[in-house]
């Protein structure tokens, strides 16, 4: 059993992660970042929960780029095949639940 205080985790570089758990082929990680990730498509489902900070989530629907601002407590669900990019607005901490080894 472990307890985590997400606001206290700081990485040494953008998208550093603290591994929290693995079950089946699913991983749960707490990420720290202050820079955008990259456009990508996961090979499975993804749950992206903002624990601290603010993140602009851009995603594509039928080739059109759309955007939504996620604040602390907000959750983004990407179904398999959803192309997206997370763009933090300053420092952010996010909990990501996804297929083990996913991009």
What name fits each language-model region?
Residues 24, 51-52, 71-72, 90:
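A cytosolic small-molecule/anion-sensing beta-strand core signal
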Residues 38-41, 45-50, 67-68, 86:
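His/acidic/aromatic-lined binding-pocket segments of jelly-roll/cupin-type domains
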Residues 80-103:
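Ligand-binding loop in jelly-roll beta-barrel domains
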Residues 30, 57-58, 96:
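Short hydrophobic/aromatic-rich beta-strand segments that constitute the beta-sheet cores
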Residues 26-42:
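Conserved short histidine dyad/triad with adjacent acidic residue
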Residues 1-30:
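A short, N-terminal "cap"/entry segment at the start of jelly-roll beta-barrel domains
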Residues 62-80:
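Short acidic-glycine-tyrosine-enriched beta hairpin
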Residues 35, 44-62:
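Glycine- and acidic-residue-biased ligand/ion/polar-headgroup-sensing regions
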């Amino acid at each position: 059993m472990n307890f985590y205080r997400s606001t206290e985790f700081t990485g040494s570089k953008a998208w550093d992660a603290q591994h929290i758990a693995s079950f089946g082929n699913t991983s749960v990680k707490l990420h720290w970042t202050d820079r955008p990730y990259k456009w990508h498509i996961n090979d499975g489902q993804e749950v992206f929960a903002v624990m601290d900070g603010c993140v602009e989530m851009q995603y594509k629907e039928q080739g059109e780029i759309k955007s939504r601002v996620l604040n602390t407590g907000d959750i983004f669900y990407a179904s398999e095949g959803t192309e997206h990019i997370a763009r933090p607005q300053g420092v952010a901490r996010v909990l990501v639940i996804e297929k083990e080894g996913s991009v």
